[in-house]
Amino acid sequence: MTQEIYISDWLEKDYKDVYNQLHKVLSEFGITPKTLPYSEEVWCRDYMPIHIGEGKYVGFNFQPDYLWDDPKYHKYITRQELAIEDLNINISDNVDIVLDGGNYVRCGDKVVMTDKIFSENPNWRPLALLCRLEEAFQAEIILLPWDMNEPFGHSDGMIAWLGDDRILLNNYHQLEKGKRKSFSTRIRKILNSQFDIVELKYGGTLSRDSWCYMNYIETDNAIILPALSMNHDGENDKAALKMFQNVFDNKVIRQVFAQPLIKHGGALHCATWNHYIL
């Protein structure tokens, strides 16, 4: 199965420096990202169909509350059917469910989501909603509590799959104060029952944007890691590089300055979408 990486044409329009750096780094690994021309904003991970394996995809309703609840933001909602118009995609199932692609992390025969999925779909009974998702994704759904400090409610900013039964967990343990301690304890309790956890930890003074390192791109032989400092020499960037080199010791790690994206709530994973060709 061949992996292609797609980006919205808005990445080049609105984030030219990030676009150029990403192109340069991906080219080192023989990858030229392709462009999605019929998109309304840069975060293509959220509105493109979800790959469930064997070249099959699931379509869904992209009407996120952070865009749908205020009519002035409706212009930024990409119509999924237009975005895939020129792509040869096998949509194996189309669910009448509101969700974002960022609230989907495939971990083998399991899918990790946040429970924001319930508030986004009040017309569904919770059990029926879960059953429909499991049918479409052909996987068991593992629910994490929604981090209310993060308005998007995406699970891909919380964990990533490392293969087998191992997952990478963001650095919640470094934020364990007050209510955050209770939140991180709940997360670990849920995940410990299903997976072996590798927790991220960064040295020095912790940046409020340290969440961004989880928002990386993975290819067959590389990890493309967001960086907060222009020359990747910030304290957190250096600590993140070392941490990821230890976790992904069989892959090359490259960094891309992504602060222009990060300040708008996303990073490299959010701004890319993977298409798999059999």
Residue ranges and their predicted role:
Residues 1-278:
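The feature marks the mature, well-folded catalytic cores of soluble enzymes
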